[in-house]
């Protein structure tokens, strides 16, 4: 029985693995001023691209701002796509499959009045 379970696990692992992916496209350009772009694609449906541009924010700060996307085919057969921007506001991914925060709820009027009252009548420290 144990050998059957081990054999079943081995067969499951072999069937679960995709064949080794082959890169069918790989483009990359690096410019002297710091900007770049790249794109890649493999034969198993994984692909991505990005473009980075050097951006001066003010006289003391500058950075490379990046915009890009990627996609892959999940084990469920669905294609998952993600786009993103990375700039002075941080990394900002967007995709249908990413979790979203709960909706904001308005503060009830009685709570707002209580907070206003407490602020107006609190002791100054």
UniProtKB/Swiss-Prot annotation:
**InterPro entries linked:** CHIT_BIND_RR_consensus, Cuticle_Struct_Prot, Insect_cuticle
Keywords attached to this Swiss-Prot or TrEMBL record, sorted alphabetically, are: Cuticle, Signal
An annotated Gene Ontology molecular function:
structural constituent of chitin-based larval cuticle
Coiled-coil ranges (or none): none
Presence of keyword ATP-binding:
no
Q: Name one Pfam family in it.
A: Chitin_bind_4
Which Gene Ontology CC terms are recorded?
Answer: chitin-based extracellular matrix
Q: Where does the Chitin-binding type R&R domain start and stop, copy by copy? A: 33-102
The source's domain of life comes to Eukaryota
> Which region is the signal sequence?
1-16
Primary role:
Component of the cuticle of the larva of tobacco hornworm.
Write the protein's name. Larval cuticle protein LCP-14
Q: Which organism is it from?
A: Manduca sexta (Tobacco hawkmoth)
Q: What is this protein's gene name?
A: LCP-14
